[in-house]
Amino acid sequence: MENMENAARKKVMLSGIQPSGDLTLGSYLGAIKNWAERDEEFDNYYFMADMHSITVRQDPAALRRRTLEQLAQYIACGLDPEKNTLFIQSHVPQHAELGWVLNCYTMFGELSRMTQFKDKSAKNSENINGGLFTYPALMAADILLYQPDYVPVGEDQKQHVELCRNIVQRFNGIYGDVFKMPEPYIPKVGARVMSLSDPTSKMSKSDKDPNGSIYLMEKPEDILRKFKRAVTDSDTENCVRYDPEHKPGVANLMTIYSAVTGKSFDEIEQEFAGKGYGAFKPAVGDAVVETLRPIREEATRILGDKAYLESVYRAGAQKASYVAEKTLRKVYKKVGFVAR
């Protein structure tokens, strides 16, 4: 327990990703790589958000498989379980318990305005369930249980984090200083990777076009094929130049190449001067293949060691539950529940 108390003195950061599909190159370069580089700086909590996944119908066996695959990929990407708390959301019941309480302090109008609810409802019109509507209240519980200083946020989650901050203000206004106000964490570095087939939209594991996303566990030949087919630009220039406004396809490929090689945009422009897209696209593919090779091999090895994987998620849930329970007890006392 002493180690747990010591860890709490560091600034706390928390994030979760739904195991609704394989992790993408965008997830790695935009978030996970950055998290791994900051494991000494913060007390980090990273979880597989399996409870959020079931707001959309899931195949149970596939969800279990993807949850463990995602955990293995987290570790293979450099999130050391000795330095980070890695756990499965459904293994920490306090998430659901605090989620219910926060539902009662979240206004119907606030939830109605969430753009993600509108988007997902449009895509899943046959299954507009209550969980989809109250998803942001559970997300607020995910965050507030661990009293984090920072929450890494993507563009698609900014609105939910703002709602979380509104809930903190409302709850603390009634009951005093219960929750710490979380700040959005926007890293100084971290590539924003766009779809290879539509460079105006973010690379996503839910992309309907399979050629738009690169997955961490993908075969090298498939990665190379996708990069060769990647959208460049319809200009007649056929030169590698960083111009996000007029050449978004090339700019996206340059962003990826820069992120995996460490080269600046100027260096990339010089390297491919006079060579055109025909030479550039396979070079980006080769660089990505070599970056992902050790991750894929390590994730495969970890998945084969079921005892190790189980020890990681059990230890993670134990530590997460210890911290979460302290917050939940405080909340239950404030709202008037009899202590158990």
Q: Predicted regions span which residues?
A:
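Short helix-capping/linker segments at secondary-structure and domain boundaries
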Residues: 108-112, 145-152, 258-268, 296
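Internal, conserved structured core segments that host functional sites
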Residues: 119-171, 175, 195
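N-terminal Rossmann-like or analogous alpha/beta NTP/dinucleotide-binding catalytic cores
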Residues: 2-141, 287, 300
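Conserved nucleotide- and phosphate/pyrophosphate-binding catalytic cores
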Residues: 159, 165-340
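Short, solvent-exposed beta-strand edge segments and adjacent coil->beta transition regions
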Residues: 14, 20, 148, 209-211
